[in-house]
């Protein structure tokens, strides 16, 4: 895959255009402030009763309702939760889009699964920073940026790709590198990673390790330290230098034990289940299940949240984290 940098992007494709950022959460505040400080004309679209209105105004941003922001804008970036985008698109975005406008996203879920089907007269693009919003913002203020993905779903004006690259540049992304992909590939890999590794797989691995030690008679505190707390040390090594950096940094005992016992935990059967999970993402079964869950009032999700919050690892973890003065309590 090719990477694009500063010389490959031209902010001129966004200059003189009105840009609306819908949402002012983690990504929304970073997009709005970075683009504004890159010299672009930005407003934020929010519900009138949103708690984010005051924060956005205090940051020097113009704030409108979603409908007003879209009507004013040439380019609209939708940074709202996936489950709310369809309804807001149908009631407040679509009626106010004009031919030649650009509709932008930071994640492809609603476009890829046809929850949102824009008119062919508008550009549809994606700019997806591969970092949380606070890091997108912080690196920009330091004169750097984070890697970004871009994609084009519809090019009505012939400038969609150039606009996506320019947006990434406005965020600071071209200083790190921008990779072009598709809505399909971004969406499917993102969902799979969350489910099988980042949020689903890792959480279940942690709980299983904790339970194994506790059921064998070891104190919950030690089980927490070994299976939850110390994971950050290892993940930081992965983050900085991959698997090799981790293996180089740990003891020979840990390296040998991990290499010989790890495959007994993540067996071919686990990988086979991962493939099933990927298939559910690819064929839309997961998307339908999630949409039905949202429409049904989150009954299953709320039950699962309650079960997880009541797990023993959460109770002992809360006590142990109180001992860690360096942690910011939330």
UniProtKB/Swiss-Prot annotation:
Enzyme class, first EC level, given as a word: oxidoreductase
* Cofactor(s) demanded: Mg(2+)
Give the stretches traversing the membrane.
Answer: none
The molecule here is called Ketol-acid reductoisomerase (NADP(+))
Q: Which family does it belong to?
A: Belongs to the ketol-acid reductoisomerase family.
Transport as a keyword of this entry, yes or no, is: no
Residues that hold Mg(2+) 2 according to the record = 190, 226, 230
Where is NADP(+) bound in this sequence?
24-27, 47, 50, 52, 82-85, 133
Q: Which reaction does it catalyse?
A: (2R)-2,3-dihydroxy-3-methylbutanoate + NADP(+) = (2S)-2-acetolactate + NADPH + H(+); (2R,3R)-2,3-dihydroxy-3-methylpentanoate + NADP(+) = (S)-2-ethyl-2-hydroxy-3-oxobutanoate + NADPH + H(+)
What residues does the KARI N-terminal Rossmann domain cover? 1-181
Q: According to the UniProt entry, what is the EC number of this protein? A: 1.1.1.86
Q: What does this protein do?
A: Involved in the biosynthesis of branched-chain amino acids (BCAA). Catalyzes an alkyl-migration followed by a ketol-acid reduction of (S)-2-acetolactate (S2AL) to yield (R)-2,3-dihydroxy-isovalerate. In the isomerase reaction, S2AL is rearranged via a Mg-dependent methyl migration to produce 3-hydroxy-3-methyl-2-ketobutyrate (HMKB). In the reductase reaction, this 2-ketoacid undergoes a metal-dependent reduction by NADPH to yield (R)-2,3-dihydroxy-isovalerate.
Annotated residues that bind substrate are located at 251
Q: Which HAMAP family match?
A: IlvC
Where does the KARI C-terminal knotted domain start and stop, copy by copy?
182-327
Gene Ontology CC terms, in alphabetical order:
cytosol
Q: Which domain of life is it from?
A: Bacteria
Print the keywords alphabetically: Amino-acid biosynthesis, Branched-chain amino acid biosynthesis, Magnesium, Metal-binding, NADP, Oxidoreductase
Origin organism lineage: Bacteria, Pseudomonadati, Chlorobiota, Chlorobiia, Chlorobiales
Record-level Gene Ontology MF annotations? ketol-acid reductoisomerase activity; magnesium ion binding; NADP binding
- State where Mg(2+) 1 binds: 190, 194
Tell me which Gene3D superfamilies the record gives.
6.10.240.10, NAD(P)-binding Rossmann-like Domain
Q: Which InterPro entries does this UniProt record tie to the protein?
A: 6-PGluconate_DH-like_C_sf, KARI, KARI_C, KARI_N, KARI_prok, NAD(P)-bd_dom_sf
The cofactor note from the UniProt entry for this protein is: Binds 2 magnesium ions per subunit.
Question: What's one Pfam family the UniProt record gives for this protein?
Answer: KARI_C
Active site annotation, chain numbering:
107
Give the record's pathway. Amino-acid biosynthesis; L-isoleucine biosynthesis; L-isoleucine from 2-oxobutanoate: step 2/4; Amino-acid biosynthesis; L-valine biosynthesis; L-valine from pyruvate: step 2/4
